[in-house]
A protein has these predicted regions:
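Catalytic domains of riboflavin
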Residues: 1-370
Length: 370
């Protein structure tokens, strides 16, 4: 463990390396993909770098870009419904419209990335399909989704470069995915720095926020007295609410429920086809425990959103999936409220990493039997 911790460079060092055009290794949390990617800023793409990724990384060479840049290029999702395990946002693959031979060579892929990453790039500059795979980062970066795609764009932006990058997963000689012990040896062999996405989240969380606390007051509910705190989503302008009972502290394990999307339907429909935990059930459990937090996301609902919610067919409890963007929003709210260790009132599921936010999921509360 000491060897692994010592091998991770501080984020300031990783940003400096990206700014200098170096290749770095970026690792995510072991509870997520648990992999390392070779990463460099798209502004510094060369055939030599692409060849290094293909020869030593062995994974799929992709090009993370921001949503704004993807729209500028007219990139469309690879599939209409993204059902991948981690919600990786692939678009249809691309090729430079001119100057390409087969498209797969290091020279051709470097040219495609150079053309597509240009600040003034337009749809006519590329053709589809091709041999380079763009990935679209979520707005808000790693504060919204703790993925390599978002981390790449964040690092390029922090380095003062175009928010586009190149990445490639690192595989072992036997074809398996390289894990941190393998990556440490790989980094030493090729003299590369290793950075952790969790550290990038922590770095950005200290300096940036996606939410702003706007008001708070005490309220009386059917389930007891709560402190109501409202937050404004700085990206979308929507309102999120938090109902707090007791005094959360980073060291104490408390009950937490993050509920999305909040609709009048969620307050009225207590049947078995709604969320894993209903609003009333969660507030009742917090009231009995004496300490806990209930976060209600997207409390600003348009008539169109309400119509869509009313039209939804019932799904089994726990069948609703949360928008990946909202994990980061919920995490920032919980951190602002002083939460550290939390037992979730939710159906057990594979979740994005919360490590960079200073949050630990200790387990899942069992829904009381009726």
């Amino acid at each position: 463990m000491r060897r692994e911790a010592a091998a991770i460079s501080p984020i300031t060092g990783i940003v400096s390396a990206i700014r200098a055009g170096e290749i770095v290794i970026l690792v995510d949390d072991e509870q997520r993909e648990n992999e390392g990617d070779l990463v460099f800023a798209a502004d510094f793409v060369t055939p030599e770098k692409i060849n290094f990724l293909a020869k030593h990384g062995r994974g799929l060479i992709c090009m993370p870009v921001t949503e704004a840049h993807a729209q500028r290029l007219g990139l469309r999702p690879m599939v209409e419904q993204n059902r991948s395990r981690h919600g990786t946002n692939f678009t249809t693959s691309i090729e430079a419209a001119e100057g390409i031979s087969t498209g797969i060579s290091a020279q051709d892929r470097a040219l495609t990335i150079k053309v597509a990453a240009a600040p003034d790039a337009k749809p006519e500059d590329i053709v589809q399909p091709g041999h380079v795979f763009p990935l679209v980062a979520q707005p808000g970066g790693v504060l919204v989704r703790a993925g390599h795609t978002e981390a790449c764009c964040d690092l390029a932006r922090l380095a003062g470069l175009s928010p586009a990058a190149v990445l490639c997963e690192i595989m072992r000689d036997d074809g398996g995915m390289a894990r941190l012990p393998d990556l440490i040896d790989f980094a030493a062999q090729h003299k590369l720095k290793i950075g952790a996405i969790a550290d990038l989240i922590e770095h950005r969380s200290r300096n940036e926020s996606l939410v702003q606390r706007v008001s708070e007051r005490d309220i009386e509910t059917t389930w007891g007295s709560f402190h109501l705190v409202s937050y404004r989503d700085l990206a979308l302008g929507s309102i999120h609410l938090a109902l707090v009972q007791g005094r959360p502290s980073p060291q104490a394990e408390i009950l937490v429920r993050v509920h999305e999307p909040l609709s009048v339907v969620d307050l009225l429909d207590a049947g078995p086809g709604t969320h894993a935990w209903g609003v009333g059930e969660a507030l009742e459990a917090i009231g009995q425990a004496g300490t806990g937090v209930m976060v209600l996301l997207n409390c600003t609902q348009t008539s169109e959103a309400l119509e869509a919610r009313l039209a939804e067919t019932r799904t089994p409890r726990g069948g609703r999936g949360m928008d990946l963007r909202l994990y980061g929003i919920g995490a920032q709210i919980l951190r602002d409220l002083g939460v550290g260790r939390m037992r979730l009132m939710a159906a057990p599921r594979k979740m994005p990493s919360m490590v960079g936010f200073g949050l630990e999921v200790t387990g899942y509360a069992e829904l009381p039997k009726r």
